[in-house]
């Protein structure tokens, strides 16, 4: 199952961007034997400001995918439950899993309503760059849990 972290905005050479890329690479390497991956980060930018314009550039990337939108009102899952959910999606035959991270103002309601589900990293608000790194780390952690690796400790 291919996993895409689809994000609005480009982080360039920020340390958080490099951290996210590192975790995505680790998840890709660790997930091969589990039929999970590759894990990629795709950055998109709208030509006009606003959530509606961002929705237009996100929409083409969502076709045929199981979509989980990161949103402050989403479901909070502990790491092990998150891993089990990713494993279930794979086992149910989903070929593509896309996680969405919106811009500074979040995701357009039209995108949120088309997502299969929403995910939150707790009740706090996180900077975009940190949310991306945290999501990439959680995907890596999920892969290691599915693999039975000692990376995650309960």
Curated annotation (Swiss-Prot):
Its main location: cytoplasm. S-adenosyl-L-methionine binds at residue 102. It is found in: Cytoplasm. Its EC number is 2.1.1.177. SUPFAM superfamilies: alpha/beta knot (SSF75217). It catalyses: pseudouridine(1915) in 23S rRNA + S-adenosyl-L-methionine = N(3)-methylpseudouridine(1915) in 23S rRNA + S-adenosyl-L-homocysteine + H(+). It comes from the Bacteria. InterPro entries: Alpha/beta_knot_MTases, RlmH-like, tRNA_m1G_MTases_N. GO terms for cellular component: cytoplasm. CDD domains: RlmH-like. GO terms for molecular function: rRNA (pseudouridine-N3-)-methyltransferase activity. It is an enzyme of class 2 (transferase). Keywords: Cytoplasm, Methyltransferase, rRNA processing, S-adenosyl-L-methionine, Transferase. Belongs to the RNA methyltransferase RlmH family. Homodimer. PANTHER family: METHYLTRANSFERASE, RIBOSOMAL RNA LARGE SUBUNIT METHYLTRANSFERASE H. Specifically methylates the pseudouridine at position 1915 (m3Psi1915) in 23S rRNA. HAMAP family: 23SrRNA_methyltr_H. This is Ribosomal RNA large subunit methyltransferase H. It comes from Caulobacter sp. (strain K31).
């Amino acid at each position: 199952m291919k996993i895409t972290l689809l994000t609005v905005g480009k982080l360039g050479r920020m340390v958080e961007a490099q951290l996210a890329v590192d975790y995505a690479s680790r998840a890709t390497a660790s997930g091969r034997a589990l039929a999970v991956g590759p894990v990629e980060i795709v950055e998109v930018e709208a030509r006009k400001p606003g959530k509606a314009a961002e929705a237009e550039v996100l929409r083409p990337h969502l076709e045929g995918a199981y979509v989980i939108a990161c949103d402050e009102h989403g479901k909070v899952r502990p790491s092990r439950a998150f891993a089990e959910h990713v494993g279930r999606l794979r086992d149910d035959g989903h070929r593509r899993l896309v996680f969405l991270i919106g811009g500074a103002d979040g995701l357009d309601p039209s995108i949120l309503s088309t997502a299969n589900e929403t995910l939150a990293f707790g009740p706090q608000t996180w900077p975009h760059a940190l949310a991306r790194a945290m999501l990439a780390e959680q995907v890596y952690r999920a892969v290691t849990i599915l693999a039975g690796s000692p990376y995650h400790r309960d």
